[in-house]
Regions:
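Short, well-ordered alpha-helical segments enriched in acidic and aromatic residues
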Residues: 51, 55-87
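Surface-exposed, charged secondary-structure patches
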Residues: 40-44, 83-136, 185-197
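Low-complexity, intrinsically disordered terminal/linker segments enriched in charged
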Residues: 44, 48, 52, 56, ...
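N-terminal secretory signal peptides that target proteins for export/translocation
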Residues: 1-16
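Bacterial Sec-dependent signal peptides at the C-terminal "C-region" and cleavage site
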Residues: 32-42
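Bacterial N-terminal signal peptides
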Residues: 23-33
């Protein structure tokens, strides 16, 4: 019995200290892995069209109208920052082609997914105004595997916001506007957006 005790290492202050740091390192690694999983769940086992659906849906709801919302779309795209746009495309709908036969497959890790926007026109932000330009805009979103997740690589388009959301955005600006001449411009813009078909 004495021989066995001789070979068993007794816990001392050094081993407790090492164990403490090991526990902290493991906890930190788990926390990082867990938080990355929360911010983006579009791993390579999922369908790449899901990233496009989520991004286009958020854009339609006006998430890109405010720069503070950048963190919301960051998990879906590969660009580092959202540029400031001088205009916003106003839409009445969109259609995402989710049939893989209609995609352009570049490789196993890269595809082009078509989206059709029903555009009413554009709202220019500097001197608020609506330029009607009814059209169907066809865009191919390049989705690629980046860091083990699907990300939109391009195109970097101006915001494509739904008509109702854009009207509400202008209404909110009207409530915050104190200058009468600017309020008149925003009122005219709201009226134009409401009439657009």
């Amino acid at each position: 019995m004495r021989r066995v005790e001789h070979w068993v290492r007794q816990p001392g202050p050094e081993s407790r200290h090492s164990l403490h740091w090991l526990a902290i390192a493991v906890s930190f690694a788990l926390l990082l892995t867990w938080s990355e999983g929360l911010t983006q769940t579009y791993g390579l086992l999922r369908d790449p069209v899901e990233v496009v659906k989520k991004y286009v849906s958020l854009d339609q709801r006006g998430i890109r109208l405010e720069s503070i919302s950048w963190e919301t779309i960051r998990p879906y795209v590969n660009w580092k920052e959202e540029p400031s746009w001088g205009h916003v495309m106003v839409t009445v709908g969109y259609k995402i082609v989710d049939d893989i036969k209609q995609w352009e497959v570049i490789s196993m890790m890269e595809v082009l997914i078509p989206v059709e926007y029903q555009v009413l026109g554009a709202v220019y932000l500097e001197a608020p105004g609506f330029l009607p330009e009814k059209q169907v805009e066809r865009v191919k979103f390049r989705v690629k595997a980046v860091g083990g997740r699907w990300r939109i690589i391009e195109p970097l388009l101006p915001p494509h916001v739904g008509q109702k959301r854009m009207i509400n955005y202008v209404r909110q600006a009207m409530l915050q506007e104190l200058e009468p001449s600017r309020l008149a411009i925003l009122t005219a813009l709201r009226d134009e957006l409401q009439k657009a078909k």
